[in-house]
Amino acid sequence: MKQTVAIIGSGAAGLASAFYLKDRFDVHLFESNPSCGGHANTITVEDTDGSHAIDTGFIVFNKPNYPHFVSLLNNLNVPYQTSDMSFAYHDKPNNHYYCSDFPRGIFAEKKLLVSPTYWRFLGELFRFKYLAQQTLNAPGSLTTLSDFLDYYNFSPYFKETYVLPMGAAIWSLSINDTLQFPLLSFLRFWDNHKLLNLIKRPQWQTVSNGSQAYVSAILSHLQNVHCNQKVHSVAKKETRAINTPFS
């Protein structure tokens, strides 16, 4: 008889765990929401061109940083395709904008070619990259992103037009929460995803037909999926079995 395993939460981590444990264990997957997937959520939008699968959460990945996810997609025979990922900034009140497409997007506004402030900003980009890598190699006493930006005297222009809006966009955070982000976690994520490399970027991929494609593929392999079942507590019994009251 197989040992029973309960997995709480059917986001990408819960689904992948259930998929890889299903052959060795009697897996039960519990989800408080009406459907599985969590952050991996796809909405179908209809227009005059037909149906379009739009992801509202997890959208892109790359092979160097997501080898296990790529392996999961390959095991499921779920196709994926190349995609673009870029960052754009637009200050509407001042009609100031640029994007990370090098070199044209960097100078999307022609007036930036003769802007001393903007050229100093570009210099700060390279200084940020250098200091970030130095900090990762030899962490000091700085604990938050705010500490780092203040200690190295980065300009308000650099903070407000690059690092803070980009960080806020990545993690869906407010500017204040981005400032308080743990420094090493912030820099390590940027380094791992080659965001500190200003020119050479990894080739990004996206799941064909949206992330719901792999959510559905995993669910087709699972027998015991319990949606609308919120787990309220987990307690060990003397026999070391796990008791999971739910409703």
Where are the regions that the model predicts?
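N-terminal glycine-rich dinucleotide-binding loop that anchors FAD/FMN and/or NAD(P) in oxidoreductases
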Residues: 43-69
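Short loop/edge segments at beta-strand edges and connector loops
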Residues: 9, 82-84, 227-229, 235
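Conserved beta-strand-loop-beta-strand element in the redox core of flavoprotein oxidoreductases
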Residues: 230-247
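Mobile amphipathic helical/loop "lid" adjacent to a hydrophobic cofactor/ligand pocket
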Residues: 63-188
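Glycine-rich FAD pyrophosphate-binding loop
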Residues: 22-46
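Short glycine/proline-enriched coil/turn segments at helix->beta-strand junctions
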Residues: 22-26, 219-224, 245
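N-terminal Rossmann-like FAD-binding beta1-loop-alpha1 element of flavoenzymes
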Residues: 3-29
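Helical element adjacent to the flavin cofactor pocket in flavoenzyme catalytic cores
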Residues: 186-234
